Amino acid sequence: MFLLVSGICPDLYHVVQRFVIYICERRYINKLLLTYLTTNNTRSCILYEDNITEKHSEYSCLCFNSEESPRVVLFDHSRGFWLSHSIPRFPSFPEKGYLYPSSGKVYGQTALCVTYQYAQLLRIVKQLVYLYPRIYNCSVPAVFSADLPQLIQLCEGSRPPQASCRRMEQLSSARGDKFVSFVKSEKYVDDIYTGWVAQVLNADLLVESWQNQGHALPSNCSLPKHAMNIKRIQLPTSIQFQSRYDHSKWCVSRVYEDHVTCLGDLNREKAQLWGGGGLICTYNPVIYKAFRQLVDWYIGC
Protein backbone atom coordinates (compact mmCIF):
# COMPACT_ATOMS: atom_id res chain seq x y z
CA MET A 1 0.00 0.00 0.00
CA PHE A 2 1.21 3.51 -0.82
CA LEU A 3 0.24 6.53 1.29
CA LEU A 4 0.57 10.09 0.05
CA VAL A 5 0.48 12.37 3.08
CA SER A 6 0.20 16.11 2.59
CA GLY A 7 0.52 18.72 5.30
CA ILE A 8 -1.00 21.49 3.22
CA CYS A 9 -4.45 20.13 2.37
CA PRO A 10 -7.44 20.27 4.76
CA ASP A 11 -7.47 17.80 7.67
CA LEU A 12 -9.80 14.81 7.34
CA TYR A 13 -9.48 14.91 3.57
CA HIS A 14 -8.66 11.56 2.07
CA VAL A 15 -9.29 9.74 -1.20
CA VAL A 16 -9.03 5.97 -1.32
CA GLN A 17 -8.07 4.13 -4.48
CA ARG A 18 -6.93 0.58 -4.90
CA PHE A 19 -3.37 0.37 -3.50
CA VAL A 20 -3.22 4.13 -2.86
CA ILE A 21 -4.64 6.40 -0.16
CA TYR A 22 -4.26 10.18 -0.36
CA ILE A 23 -4.57 11.44 3.21
CA CYS A 24 -4.12 14.51 5.37
CA GLU A 25 -5.19 12.96 8.68
CA ARG A 26 -1.87 11.86 10.18
CA ARG A 27 -3.42 9.63 12.82
CA TYR A 28 -4.24 6.98 10.18
CA ILE A 29 -0.58 5.99 10.24
CA ASN A 30 -0.99 5.10 13.91
CA LYS A 31 -2.75 1.88 12.91
CA LEU A 32 0.31 0.72 10.98
CA LEU A 33 2.42 0.90 14.12
CA LEU A 34 0.17 -0.84 16.65
CA THR A 35 1.95 -4.11 15.98
CA TYR A 36 5.35 -2.45 16.29
CA LEU A 37 4.48 -1.06 19.73
CA THR A 38 3.38 -4.49 20.98
CA THR A 39 6.25 -6.67 19.73
CA ASN A 40 7.24 -9.77 21.67
CA ASN A 41 10.12 -12.23 21.71
CA THR A 42 8.84 -14.17 18.70
CA ARG A 43 9.07 -11.17 16.38
CA SER A 44 12.00 -9.15 15.13
CA CYS A 45 11.67 -5.45 14.46
CA ILE A 46 13.97 -2.87 12.90
CA LEU A 47 13.53 0.91 12.73
CA TYR A 48 16.07 3.32 11.29
CA GLU A 49 16.33 7.07 10.66
CA ASP A 50 18.68 10.05 10.42
CA ASN A 51 19.63 12.61 13.07
CA ILE A 52 19.26 10.35 16.10
CA THR A 53 20.04 12.23 19.30
CA GLU A 54 18.93 9.66 21.90
CA LYS A 55 20.04 6.09 22.55
CA HIS A 56 17.78 3.41 24.02
CA SER A 57 18.17 -0.30 24.63
CA GLU A 58 16.49 -3.38 26.10
CA TYR A 59 13.38 -3.30 23.96
CA SER A 60 12.20 -6.13 21.73
CA CYS A 61 12.39 -4.16 18.53
CA LEU A 62 15.03 -3.01 16.04
CA CYS A 63 14.80 0.51 14.69
CA PHE A 64 16.97 2.00 11.96
CA ASN A 65 17.41 4.92 9.55
CA SER A 66 18.93 5.51 6.14
CA GLU A 67 20.19 8.77 4.67
CA GLU A 68 16.90 10.66 4.61
CA SER A 69 14.04 8.43 5.68
CA PRO A 70 13.11 6.15 8.57
CA ARG A 71 12.03 2.60 7.94
CA VAL A 72 10.42 -0.18 9.93
CA VAL A 73 10.82 -3.91 9.45
CA LEU A 74 8.75 -6.19 11.68
CA PHE A 75 8.41 -9.94 11.20
CA ASP A 76 8.05 -13.35 12.78
CA HIS A 77 8.90 -16.74 11.28
CA SER A 78 5.83 -16.64 9.04
CA ARG A 79 5.68 -13.16 7.54
CA GLY A 80 6.12 -9.49 8.26
CA PHE A 81 6.10 -6.03 6.73
CA TRP A 82 8.58 -3.44 5.49
CA LEU A 83 7.41 0.15 5.96
CA SER A 84 9.36 2.79 4.03
CA HIS A 85 8.46 6.47 4.23
CA SER A 86 9.81 10.01 4.04
CA ILE A 87 8.58 11.34 7.40
CA PRO A 88 11.57 12.59 9.45
CA ARG A 89 12.10 11.15 12.95
CA PHE A 90 9.15 8.80 12.73
CA PRO A 91 8.23 6.48 14.37
CA SER A 92 9.25 7.61 17.82
CA PHE A 93 10.97 5.49 20.44
CA PRO A 94 8.57 2.72 21.56
CA GLU A 95 8.34 3.80 25.19
CA LYS A 96 7.08 7.21 24.06
CA GLY A 97 4.05 5.69 22.34
CA TYR A 98 2.68 7.00 19.06
CA LEU A 99 3.96 10.48 18.22
CA TYR A 100 3.73 12.16 14.83
CA PRO A 101 6.51 14.75 14.42
CA SER A 102 5.55 18.36 13.80
CA SER A 103 8.09 18.44 10.95
CA GLY A 104 5.97 15.88 9.09
CA LYS A 105 2.84 18.06 9.15
CA VAL A 106 4.11 20.90 6.97
CA TYR A 107 5.39 19.19 3.83
CA GLY A 108 4.12 16.38 1.61
CA GLN A 109 5.24 12.84 2.52
CA THR A 110 4.94 9.32 1.13
CA ALA A 111 4.88 5.87 2.71
CA LEU A 112 4.98 2.35 1.32
CA CYS A 113 4.01 -0.68 3.41
CA VAL A 114 4.34 -4.16 1.91
CA THR A 115 3.74 -7.55 3.55
CA TYR A 116 6.28 -10.27 2.75
CA GLN A 117 6.71 -13.92 3.58
CA TYR A 118 9.64 -14.72 5.87
CA ALA A 119 11.90 -15.95 3.04
CA GLN A 120 11.58 -12.56 1.32
CA LEU A 121 12.46 -10.75 4.52
CA LEU A 122 15.76 -12.61 4.58
CA ARG A 123 16.48 -10.97 1.21
CA ILE A 124 15.52 -7.58 2.60
CA VAL A 125 18.08 -7.94 5.37
CA LYS A 126 20.79 -8.37 2.73
CA GLN A 127 19.69 -5.05 1.25
CA LEU A 128 19.98 -3.36 4.63
CA VAL A 129 23.66 -4.26 4.80
CA TYR A 130 24.30 -1.90 1.88
CA LEU A 131 22.24 0.87 3.45
CA TYR A 132 24.21 0.49 6.70
CA PRO A 133 21.33 2.19 8.51
CA ARG A 134 21.59 4.16 11.72
CA ILE A 135 19.84 1.85 14.16
CA TYR A 136 18.15 3.48 17.12
CA ASN A 137 16.13 0.55 18.44
CA CYS A 138 16.79 -3.12 17.78
CA SER A 139 15.49 -6.51 18.81
CA VAL A 140 16.51 -9.78 17.19
CA PRO A 141 15.37 -12.64 19.45
CA ALA A 142 17.65 -15.67 19.71
CA VAL A 143 15.26 -17.74 17.60
CA PHE A 144 16.37 -15.68 14.55
CA SER A 145 20.13 -15.76 15.18
CA ALA A 146 20.89 -18.66 12.82
CA ASP A 147 19.03 -17.06 9.89
CA LEU A 148 20.01 -13.44 10.46
CA PRO A 149 23.67 -13.12 11.50
CA GLN A 150 24.06 -9.96 9.39
CA LEU A 151 21.11 -8.33 11.14
CA ILE A 152 22.66 -9.07 14.51
CA GLN A 153 25.89 -7.45 13.34
CA LEU A 154 24.00 -4.32 12.30
CA CYS A 155 22.26 -4.19 15.67
CA GLU A 156 25.63 -4.40 17.41
CA GLY A 157 26.93 -1.48 15.38
CA SER A 158 29.31 -3.41 13.13
CA ARG A 159 29.17 -3.51 9.35
CA PRO A 160 29.00 -6.87 7.55
CA PRO A 161 31.21 -7.15 4.44
CA GLN A 162 29.76 -6.11 1.07
CA ALA A 163 30.47 -7.74 -2.27
CA SER A 164 30.12 -4.40 -4.09
CA CYS A 165 28.92 -0.83 -3.54
CA ARG A 166 25.35 -1.49 -4.74
CA ARG A 167 22.82 -4.31 -4.93
CA MET A 168 19.54 -5.08 -6.69
CA GLU A 169 17.04 -7.64 -5.37
CA GLN A 170 13.79 -9.00 -6.81
CA LEU A 171 11.07 -9.18 -4.14
CA SER A 172 7.59 -10.68 -4.10
CA SER A 173 4.89 -9.58 -1.66
CA ALA A 174 2.84 -12.08 0.33
CA ARG A 175 0.12 -11.76 -2.32
CA GLY A 176 2.52 -12.17 -5.22
CA ASP A 177 3.04 -8.56 -6.35
CA LYS A 178 6.53 -8.03 -7.77
CA PHE A 179 8.95 -5.37 -6.55
CA VAL A 180 12.57 -4.49 -7.32
CA SER A 181 14.77 -3.13 -4.53
CA PHE A 182 17.79 -0.98 -5.43
CA VAL A 183 20.24 -0.08 -2.65
CA LYS A 184 23.60 1.65 -2.72
CA SER A 185 26.26 2.32 -0.12
CA GLU A 186 28.07 5.62 0.29
CA LYS A 187 30.86 4.17 -1.87
CA TYR A 188 28.63 4.35 -4.95
CA VAL A 189 29.09 8.05 -5.71
CA ASP A 190 26.42 8.83 -8.27
CA ASP A 191 22.82 9.89 -8.64
CA ILE A 192 20.92 6.64 -8.12
CA TYR A 193 18.06 7.78 -10.37
CA THR A 194 20.13 8.71 -13.43
CA GLY A 195 23.19 6.53 -13.13
CA TRP A 196 21.55 3.26 -12.18
CA VAL A 197 17.77 2.86 -11.83
CA ALA A 198 16.71 4.56 -15.06
CA GLN A 199 19.27 2.56 -17.05
CA VAL A 200 18.38 -0.81 -15.47
CA LEU A 201 14.62 -0.28 -15.82
CA ASN A 202 15.14 1.15 -19.32
CA ALA A 203 12.81 4.07 -18.65
CA ASP A 204 13.01 7.85 -18.53
CA LEU A 205 12.13 8.85 -14.97
CA LEU A 206 10.23 11.84 -13.60
CA VAL A 207 11.59 12.35 -10.09
CA GLU A 208 9.95 14.03 -7.11
CA SER A 209 12.42 14.70 -4.29
CA TRP A 210 13.37 17.27 -1.66
CA GLN A 211 15.65 19.80 -3.38
CA ASN A 212 15.64 22.62 -0.85
CA GLN A 213 19.24 22.31 0.36
CA GLY A 214 20.75 24.64 -2.22
CA HIS A 215 22.64 22.04 -4.26
CA ALA A 216 19.92 20.42 -6.35
CA LEU A 217 20.90 18.23 -9.28
CA PRO A 218 19.38 19.45 -12.56
CA SER A 219 17.43 17.19 -14.91
CA ASN A 220 19.95 14.86 -16.55
CA CYS A 221 19.69 13.55 -20.12
CA SER A 222 23.37 12.61 -20.59
CA LEU A 223 22.74 8.84 -20.55
CA PRO A 224 20.44 6.74 -22.77
CA LYS A 225 17.65 7.00 -20.18
CA HIS A 226 16.98 10.28 -18.43
CA ALA A 227 16.02 11.57 -14.96
CA MET A 228 13.98 14.78 -14.91
CA ASN A 229 12.87 16.81 -11.90
CA ILE A 230 9.19 17.24 -11.12
CA LYS A 231 8.36 20.81 -10.14
CA ARG A 232 4.63 20.81 -9.42
CA ILE A 233 2.19 18.25 -7.99
CA GLN A 234 -1.56 18.06 -8.65
CA LEU A 235 -3.50 15.98 -6.10
CA PRO A 236 -7.10 14.84 -6.68
CA THR A 237 -9.83 17.49 -6.25
CA SER A 238 -7.52 20.21 -7.64
CA ILE A 239 -5.08 20.44 -4.71
CA GLN A 240 -1.84 21.75 -6.23
CA PHE A 241 1.57 22.63 -4.76
CA GLN A 242 5.17 23.22 -5.80
CA SER A 243 7.79 20.52 -5.21
CA ARG A 244 9.58 22.74 -2.69
CA TYR A 245 6.69 21.94 -0.32
CA ASP A 246 7.07 18.19 -0.84
CA HIS A 247 9.48 16.13 1.28
CA SER A 248 8.63 12.83 -0.45
CA LYS A 249 11.03 10.91 -2.72
CA TRP A 250 9.50 8.97 -5.61
CA CYS A 251 9.62 8.66 -9.36
CA VAL A 252 7.52 7.42 -12.26
CA SER A 253 8.33 6.57 -15.85
CA ARG A 254 7.71 9.42 -18.27
CA VAL A 255 6.24 7.05 -20.86
CA TYR A 256 2.92 5.60 -19.72
CA GLU A 257 3.53 2.21 -21.31
CA ASP A 258 6.55 1.57 -19.03
CA HIS A 259 4.40 1.56 -15.84
CA VAL A 260 7.39 2.17 -13.52
CA THR A 261 6.81 3.58 -10.02
CA CYS A 262 9.54 3.80 -7.36
CA LEU A 263 9.55 5.07 -3.79
CA GLY A 264 12.88 5.85 -2.18
CA ASP A 265 14.87 7.68 0.46
CA LEU A 266 17.37 9.71 -1.59
CA ASN A 267 16.97 13.20 -3.01
CA ARG A 268 18.47 14.51 -6.22
CA GLU A 269 20.88 16.67 -4.20
CA LYS A 270 24.65 16.83 -4.62
CA ALA A 271 25.40 15.82 -1.01
CA GLN A 272 23.41 12.63 -1.41
CA LEU A 273 25.64 11.37 -4.20
CA TRP A 274 27.88 10.25 -1.32
CA GLY A 275 25.04 8.82 0.77
CA GLY A 276 23.63 5.34 1.17
CA GLY A 277 20.01 4.73 0.30
CA GLY A 278 17.70 3.10 -2.17
CA LEU A 279 14.43 2.71 -4.05
CA ILE A 280 11.67 0.12 -4.17
CA CYS A 281 10.10 -0.12 -7.62
CA THR A 282 7.02 -1.78 -9.08
CA TYR A 283 5.44 -2.21 -12.51
CA ASN A 284 1.91 -2.32 -11.07
CA PRO A 285 -0.26 -0.32 -13.53
CA VAL A 286 -2.76 0.79 -10.89
CA ILE A 287 -0.06 2.21 -8.64
CA TYR A 288 1.59 3.81 -11.66
CA LYS A 289 -1.60 5.55 -12.74
CA ALA A 290 -2.16 6.92 -9.24
CA PHE A 291 1.31 8.46 -9.10
CA ARG A 292 1.68 9.48 -12.74
CA GLN A 293 -1.46 11.60 -12.61
CA LEU A 294 0.11 13.64 -9.80
CA VAL A 295 2.78 15.05 -12.15
CA ASP A 296 1.59 18.49 -13.20
CA TRP A 297 4.89 19.95 -14.41
CA TYR A 298 8.45 18.69 -14.82
CA ILE A 299 11.71 20.14 -16.17
CA GLY A 300 12.88 18.45 -19.37
CA CYS A 301 16.38 18.54 -20.82
Stretches with model-predicted labels:
Residues M1-C301:
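PLD/PLD-like phosphodiesterase catalytic module centered on the HKD motif
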